[in-house]
Amino acid sequence: MININTSFKRIHSLLILTFLCFLILINKTYSEEKIGSVVALKGEIIAINTDDEKRTLDIYDDIFLFDEIVTDNSSSATIQYDDNSTVIIKSSSSLTITEFVFSIAKKKFLGIVKKGKVIIESGKIAKAQEGSMEIQLPTMILGIKGTRFNMKINPDGTSEVGLSEDSFGEVGTINISSDGKVQTLYDTDQVISANIETGISERPKTDDEKKELADASNDLIEASSIDDNLIQEKLEEKLANGTLLDANNDGIIDLSDIDIIKENIKIEKQENINFIAENSTGENTEFLSNVLNQSDEASIGQSMNHILETNDYLVASVITNLSNEDNTFLTTSNVEANNAIKEKIFTQMLSDTDDENNNIAVIGSIFAKSDAESVALMMDTIQTVGETNAHSTLALEVLSSMADSESFYDMDFGDE
């Protein structure tokens, strides 16, 4: 005779065991969710997962949810998260991201800083109206809305926070909660502190603190730019050191894995440049231009093509900035695919009658530095635009502004 109670208990126990295994699996899955990657580092950086397992981080390594990133007294790291937030972790510091959701339905970024100093340039989550970005420090909780800010935990346990303009010239706000009190930080010249004994206080920001926040721009430019040769070099070092992943899962780690990983890195970086372009204005393209100026020519071309399609009002300002830096994207014909993109750029600039004189001067200065092939290639575009706009002197004006170009005198215009 079947004992129903015994069978039921066995089934019940089996269901409980299955449910517990499911919870463990879910927790493991969430803890292994990639949320960002290391884009720059100095010295030894350690990541500690939820199982208290430690791993040494290398350039381009993935960062997972609940990883505690720890630096020692001579190391630092720059992490770029999947919402385009960039975090600079200074020496003797610790950062853990405990929740990261970036979807249409929900946008949330929660982190904990236990010690040291961290600078954050907020990304899409903090800039979204419905987004929520919170960072917990020992004596305060920060609610951030679209800005660059730094946090520091002093040896006496006091937590401090200050904000500054972000890469786009915007200043957001930080809501600071401590011991039941809430204060909002708007002023870039102030630092707000919270101590268990003395509560919330504020003081002027020092010149060194202002400089440190401003100097973070250099780290952000480096983190965002795309240099194919540099990425290749770093990945080859990882291959030689035995830290490269088997990207194609063929059981062999070799140059084919470098190709896959490099392509993924460049895609992520390109998405970040697109984010930078989307948040730039015609009056403030300095950061975007600096990122492009430190990128390789093919990546500049890809970025400029995206800008032409989505943010064409930025084109003239970016090209003006790049022309002042003698950027080879503008002055050489090394990447064939870029020629068509440059034709689009110059066509738009020369068709803009509102700022025609400035654009002609910029294009002339570019051509004065260009190789003969680049100059010859663009002359057809200039002449075509002049005819289309019924402006017969346009080509002559550009040619006049090119008078200092040695390559101009070497050009062969044919027998016409």
Predicted regions mapped to residue ranges:
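N-terminal beta-strand/beta-hairpin edge segment
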Residues: E53, I59-D61, D67-E68, N73-V87, ...
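Residue-level detection of beta-strand scaffold positions
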Residues: I63, E68, I89, N305, ...
